Amino acid sequence: MKVTRKRAQRERRHRRVRRKIFGTPERPRLSVYRSNVHTYAQLIDDIAGHTLAAADSREVGEAESRVEAARKVGELIASRAREAGIERAVFDRGGYKYHGRVAALAEGARAGGLKF
């Protein structure tokens, strides 16, 4: 499958998911982005259009694998959410399948105390 077609499919899935979920200041959207090398996460207040907290795999240091790095990103975003007074979030998988790095990030965030 060509890269452009895969990206178009992911963007369609993301638009479909985004129609249903919305972040508020009390329960922001935990948005995930995956590049080939790194994993990024943001807590977004969609009403104000502001990012409340962010973390990425460049900050967590060395990891054995990209999945392990994503789990550490989840734990880091959960700790930053606690610092900002956020306990709950809406998980936005960004059109990616809930598998591998995306699932590891979600599990790490849950292990860090974030609820969704």
From Swiss-Prot:
Source domain of life: Bacteria
InterPro entries: Ribosomal_uL18_bac-type, Ribosomal_uL18_bac/euk
Keywords: Ribonucleoprotein, Ribosomal protein, RNA-binding, rRNA-binding
GO cellular component: cytosolic large ribosomal subunit
Gene Ontology annotations of biological process type: translation
Annotated CDD domains: Ribosomal_L18_L5e (cd00432)
Coiled coil start-end: none
A Pfam family annotated for this UniProt entry: Ribosomal_L18p
GO molecular function: 5S rRNA binding; structural constituent of ribosome
Subunit record text: Part of the 50S ribosomal subunit; part of the 5S rRNA/L5/L18/L25 subcomplex. Contacts the 5S and 23S rRNAs.
NCBIfam families in the cross-refs: L18_bact
Family assignment from sequence similarity: Belongs to the universal ribosomal protein uL18 family.
Purpose of the protein: This is one of the proteins that bind and probably mediate the attachment of the 5S RNA into the large ribosomal subunit, where it forms part of the central protuberance.
Name of this chain's protein: Large ribosomal subunit protein uL18
Organism name: Rubrobacter xylanophilus (strain DSM 9941 / JCM 11954 / NBRC 16129 / PRD-1)
